[in-house]
């Protein structure tokens, strides 16, 4: 009796990581199917530009890789879902004075939810991506573990996994360094082996989110006042969507000293300006929580926490609140804690969970 190969659908962006992920899984004996999520909108600038995972060139790169690996390739239409679950909330968050992370929302709602359900609907056992993270089962629970390549670790953007999603997801790149992934791609003759990493927001071609929001919702972007913490007017801003906490460049203010964005008030349409010391805080409130290592936080625990993708984990205590949110208290002050960003909790290399920063205390 022959054993049936397990089927895996690999989400392919046209980049080197997902391409090598497909190769590694085929080598491990899986029946591999390549698929690219078509998420670009009716926007020729985005559709035709080079590089990003939304572009037509990325689809062609993924198709060529699948031809090389001799695996089937499909393009799946996620346009409506991407607009509803990623783009529209992204715009609204900025209008509401927060700074969102669209990659986290895309992972949560599309890649590891809708794509997984579509895959299971056609009899596929697993989905896989080129993310730098590891999934391991310990006792009766799946764990999300930091990548072996600390510089490229992507667990910050992956904390929303459910146990069922982890059970049906493969991330083969987590066992390798980025340099080794590129070497493998070159060794097997993949043209994407030296393709540049995509670092900008995939649906914004010039990385100018303010201009993007102005074009999408012109009536929602209004100029207002820069004020100090006492409410004194220091100048005019061009719309709160252009600013984020801790920002110094591009303010267009001349006040004789270095100043930074310390708060954004959508109710009054004001951007609060202050000294650098004003953007260092130790406490925050987070909501929209997801925990991986347990179902619910019952008591306060000590963790390491990251407040943005590029931050180093810092020692903190998370305290459950009666309303279902948590208070996070850092041992040391953190620079530019920002509403709308995620705070992610770690125990060493293990991801405990995370949530959205809703308030800074």
Swiss-Prot record:
Matching SUPFAM superfamilies: Adenine nucleotide alpha hydrolases-like
Reaction catalysed by this enzyme: S-sulfanyl-L-cysteinyl-[protein] + uridine(34) in tRNA + AH2 + ATP = 2-thiouridine(34) in tRNA + L-cysteinyl-[protein] + A + AMP + diphosphate + H(+)
Q: Name one GO cellular component term.
A: cytoplasm
For the ligand (ATP), the binding residues are 11-18, 37, 130
Q: What class of enzyme is it?
A: transferase
Q: In this UniProt entry, which cysteines form S-S bonds?
A: 106-202
Q: Does the keyword Cytoplasm apply?
A: yes
Q: Which residues form the active site?
A: 106 (nucleophile), 202 (cysteine persulfide intermediate)
**Which GO molecular function annotation, any one, does this entry have?**
tRNA binding
Record's subcellular location: Cytoplasm
In the Enzyme Commission scheme, what number(s) does this protein have? 2.8.1.13
Q: Which residues cross the membrane?
A: none
Region (Interaction with tRNA) residue ranges read: 152-154, 308-309
Q: Positions of the site: Interaction with tRNA? A: 131, 341
Going by the UniProt record, its keywords in alphabetical order are: ATP-binding, Cytoplasm, Disulfide bond, Nucleotide-binding, RNA-binding, Transferase, tRNA processing, tRNA-binding
Sorted alphabetically, which CDD domains does this protein's record hold?
A: MnmA_TRMU-like
Cross-referenced Gene3D superfamilies: Adenine nucleotide alpha hydrolases-like domains, HUPs, Translation factors
**Which GO annotations describe the biological process of this protein?**
tRNA wobble position uridine thiolation
The similarity comment for this entry is: Belongs to the MnmA/TRMU family.
Task: Say what the protein does.
Answer: Catalyzes the 2-thiolation of uridine at the wobble position (U34) of tRNA, leading to the formation of s(2)U34.
Name of the molecule in the record: tRNA-specific 2-thiouridylase MnmA
Q: Which organism is it from?
A: Clostridium botulinum (strain Alaska E43 / Type E3)
**Gene that encodes the chain:** mnmA
């Amino acid at each position: 009796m022959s054993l049936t190969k397990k089927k895996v659908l690999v989400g392919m962006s046209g980049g080197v990581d997902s391409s090598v992920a497909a190769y590694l899984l085929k080598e491990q004996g899986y029946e591999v199917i390549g698929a690219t999520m078509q998420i670009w909108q009716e926007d020729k600038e985005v559709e035709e530009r080079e590089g990003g995972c939304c572009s037509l060139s990325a689809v062609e790169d993924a198709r060529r890789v699948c031809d090389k690996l001799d695996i089937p390739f499909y393009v799946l239409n996620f346009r409506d879902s991407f607009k509803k679950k990623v783009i529209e909330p992204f715009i609204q968050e900025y209008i509401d004075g927060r700074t969102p992370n669209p990659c986290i929302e895309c992972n949560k709602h599309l890649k590891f939810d809708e794509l997984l359900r579509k895959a299971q609907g056609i009899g596929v056992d697993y989905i896989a991506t080129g993310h730098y993270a590891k999934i391991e089962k310990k006792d009766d629970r799946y764990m999300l573990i930091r990548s072996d390549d600390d510089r490229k670790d992507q667990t910050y953007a992956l904390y929303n996994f459910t146990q069922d999603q982890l059970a049906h997801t493969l991330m083969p790149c987590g066992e390798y360094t980025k340099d080794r992934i590129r070497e493998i791609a070159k060794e097997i003759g993949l043209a994407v082996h030296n393709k540049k990493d995509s670092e900008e927001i995939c649906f914004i071609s010039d990385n100018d989110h303010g201009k993007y929001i102005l074009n999408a919702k012109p009536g929602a972007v209004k100029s207002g006042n820069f004020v100090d913490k006492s409410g004194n007017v220091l100048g005019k801003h061009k719309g709160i969507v252009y600013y984020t906490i801790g920002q110094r460049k591009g303010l267009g203010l001349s006040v004789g000293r270095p100043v930074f964005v310390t708060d954004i008030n959508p109710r009054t349409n004001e951007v609060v300006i202050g000294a650098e010391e004003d953007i260092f805080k130790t406490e925050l409130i987070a909501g929209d929580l997801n925990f991986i290592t347990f179902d619910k936080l019952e008591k306060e625990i000590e963790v390491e926490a990251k407040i943005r993708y590029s931050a180093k984990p810092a020692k903190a205590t998370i305290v459950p609140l009666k309303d279902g949110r948590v208070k996070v208290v850092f041992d040391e002050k953190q620079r530019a804690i920002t509403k709308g960003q995620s705070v992610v909790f770690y125990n060493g290399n293990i991801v405990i969970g995370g949530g959205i920063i809703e308030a800074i205390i």
